[in-house]
Amino acid sequence: MNNQVQLYSLVKKLYQANFWEDYWDNDIIGIQLPDHKDPVFISILGKAEQNFGFLIYRNLEELSYYFEMRKQAEFSEFNSAIEMLQTHKCISLNFEDRKEIPKEEYEKIKASGVTFRGKKAWPVFTDYKPGYYPFAINEKDVSFLIAVFEKLIETATDFRASLQFYEKEQETYEILMRTYKRDGSYEDGFYVVPEAILEGVLDNEVEYASIKLTDFEMKRVNNQKMKHTIWELDIDFIGVPVVPPNGGRPIFPSLLIVADTKNSEVICSEFVNPIEAEKIQRIIIQLILAQNGKPPKIVVNANRYVKIASCLENLLTTLDIELVPVQKLPLLSVVKEDMLEYFKD
């Protein structure tokens, strides 16, 4: 039996098991595979919204994105689909109508010889990674998923009798866990999710970039006077995927955009890599010099505050500029909507 046949045969068994009749999406299951460093974590979808499927988090780092997604959904609405995508880092298996699945997926299913029929019954795999366009799984993923699904079918079946565990109030966040040994035997227990993972992605310990500029550059910009204005600043993904020059998986480029609220003018719009702190710092001081003055305050979207602060906090503190998180950037929100419409056209 080749990998595709084995994969879709297991997928059909998962579909027929109807786990979403009993599991809520926050009833996370943990499975420790013998040759896997971290446990694999699975969320079962469908009981609440009738969108049937599974989210497979390959390790603890990916699980932190699950909690980040929950946190952001609870405390603020996602402004766009691209913003929501940045909280996804996992493999999803969703069951869709036949007419809604991509042609490539249909060809794989057809070639496997495994039959699927009915509404919301056709499997679609998607690999999610922040900054990248949702993509098809690769052959390495197929082998991994076969190993997971073989264990998930029996584990989720057995744990059905223990789901009342998730209804109890817990001092720590625990999930049902099955640990497999190389000989196929297993032990059932509970897994305490580390506090750092529960905090999500953005609240994990952040390394603030040092000032990457020369003393001459800093002296020059420090001599600028404070202006009576506030800047809005954002570094966010643009929802139009771009294929890298060397090919491969399409990416969502990041755009640094700055607006001066005093005259309602966009003063910077430049594509950047969020990890290139030196480039971002240099753009800011060039803006200050071009505007002949420093803003006493720069406001940023609260959801991206940590990411932006990691690049700019030390620089702005030295320049006596306050970096302030806010729930919404009034001027840039409108500007970004107009830009998205432009890209769509």
What residue ranges belong to the model's regions?
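Secondary-structure boundary/capping micro-motif
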Residues: 1-256, 261-345
